[in-house]
């Protein structure tokens, strides 16, 4: 099995899921979709099963508990690589990542980079020229910009939008990342993955996207999540400067965390 896989993690996204999946399938008809649901009490998982039953390109992973965005992505990456998908895309369920812009990410992936190699990871960026946000309050924009800038400074990253979640990976490049060493489950997962991608020597580029605030449902973001991410980034940065990076955290949440595999193969 080959082709593009768009991974959509969900928790209480019943109001948004069907529209997002339909837009992905319209924007990139050849792509498959994997919904990774953390036992949403609002019935998102049941809706995902209905979508999979109606469309053979839609698949579902049901996880037995809410274990964080990072754990959901890590399990889905393992599944995608086992099934032979390439490339692998991250996309939010709430409509904030516009599926209509996915072709621009996929087009850049695999093209020559500035060093004469191939682009391994494309990030849809809000903070490069041409990128933008819609309907965000000023304080949230400032917080996001600060988070990216702080991660860049602490970890010596080149990426302008280090916390962005709209990403496309080449499968071969993802295999070079030590996914078993990516332990972050919450907001800091995107930075953790980016840092590991850099350490693995991946070629990373950004393309401009428009990030749109959700119009239905509640955001999962909170001050506690942001603080946790900042603490982790600080610890990683200090360890990278003054000693070996050590992560005393649980291993990959994909192990034993799924109640069922895919609804459709």
Where on the chain are the PLM-derived regions?
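Hydrophobic helical membrane-anchoring modules
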Residues: 1-3, 156, 180-265
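Short, well-formed alpha-helical segments that are part of the catalytic scaffolds
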Residues: 13-27
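Short, conserved active-site loop motifs that form the nucleotide-linked donor/cofactor pocket
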Residues: 4, 31, 57-59
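Acceptor/aglycone-binding surface of glycosyltransferases and processive sugar-polymer synthases
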Residues: 61-82, 99-187, 214-229
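Short beta-strand-to-loop acidic/aromatic patch adjacent to the donor-nucleotide binding site
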Residues: 85-96
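Acidic helix N-cap motif at the loop->helix transition within catalytic regions
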Residues: 15-19, 42-51
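Short beta-strand/loop segment that forms part of the nucleotide-sugar
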Residues: 30-40, 62
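A conserved acidic beta->alpha catalytic loop
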Residues: 37-46, 95
């Amino acid at each position: 099995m080959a082709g593009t896989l768009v991974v959509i993690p969900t928790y209480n996204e019943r109001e948004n899921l069907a529209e997002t999946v339909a837009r992905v399938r319209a924007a990139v008809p050849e792509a498959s979709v994997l919904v990774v649901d953390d036992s949403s009490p609002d019935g998102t998982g049941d809706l995902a099963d209905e979508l999979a039953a109606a469309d053979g390109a839609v698949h579902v992973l049901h996880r037995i508990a809410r274990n964080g965005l990072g754990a959901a992505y890590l399990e889905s990456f393992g599944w995608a690589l086992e099934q032979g998908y390439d490339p692998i895309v991250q996309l939010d369920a709430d409509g904030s990542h516009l599926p209509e812009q996915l072709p621009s990410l996929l087009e850049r992936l695999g093209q020559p980079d500035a060093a004469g190699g191939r682009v391994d990871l494309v990030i849809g960026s809000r903070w490069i020229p041409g990128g933008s946000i819609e309907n965000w309050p000023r304080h949230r924009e400032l917080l996001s910009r600060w988070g990216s800038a702080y991660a860049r400074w602490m970890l010596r990253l080149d990426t302008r939008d280090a916390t962005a979640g709209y990403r496309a990976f080449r499968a071969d490049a993802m295999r070079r990342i030590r996914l078993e060493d990516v332990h972050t489950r919450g907001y800091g997962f995107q930075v953790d993955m980016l840092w590991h991608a850099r350490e693995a020597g991946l070629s990373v580029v950004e393309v401009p996207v428009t990030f749109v605030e959700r119009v239905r449902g509640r955001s999962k973001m909170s001050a506690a999540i942001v603080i946790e991410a900042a603490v982790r980034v600080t610890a990683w940065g200090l360890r990278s400067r003054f000693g070996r990076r050590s992560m005393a955290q649980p291993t990959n949440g994909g192990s034993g965390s799924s109640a069922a595999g895919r609804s459709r193969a």
